[in-house]
């Protein structure tokens, strides 16, 4: 027996579909307008709060597929750029943070033992709060996330809405642009870092950096004791950014603290950076390949048990 839909039913379904589409568009436009005109609704500044634990949670769930790890600040988000991923190599990007919080988490994930760990040095002075660490390593929270995936940071509505509504447009370098032209035109984009890190480091700040250096040494020693090879690297920052007081002082202290470790660095003039810090796609691939050239043979073959 063939089922038939009456003309009135078809009209009803058509109206229902139309109103659904209209309401969806209206809700989207209303949300965008409200977020742009009512600061309390604009949650974009909270994105790092969810992006950092989301990336750390992702590593905690998939560490067996990560015999090689690249750990660092938002700079690592371009190592490698999308589409250039290498099997067995996982990047842990900590937006608004540095390597310290990642090392704290990895030291507590005793079952996760990468063969090689690349650690970005440049922004390691950023503190690691106990709450950020517990959000990923607390066994009760981890059990809840295992049973209820919607409880993970990556499933948070702010995270999903931000990624859907505010994609980051990649600025590409064109062969007609010299490095000097690129550098000069993008100076305004690096002004924010000059404002944040441009002040001299006072005595309290120097003492605090020493505390973080000591923590770095303890965490790296613990991770190395499990059989992981740790390689440190300096991001090829624009000289204007690299010479800022706290960044320059931290870089000096890190090299003094780890003189016997393998270091990877390169001239900044080889790379095109969007804002004096973050790679364009091609430059990210170039620096990523430089890191990969320091891998021991067979490092990506399989994860350590």
Q: Where are the regions that the model predicts?
A:
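N-terminal Lys/Arg-rich, disordered targeting/topogenic segments
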Residues: 1-13
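Hydrophobic membrane-insertion alpha-helices, especially the h-region
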Residues: 11-35
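Alpha-helical transmembrane signal-anchor/signal-peptide segments
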Residues: 34-56
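Short extracytoplasmic
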Residues: 49-79
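Substrate-gating cap/lid alpha-helix
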Residues: 212, 228-266
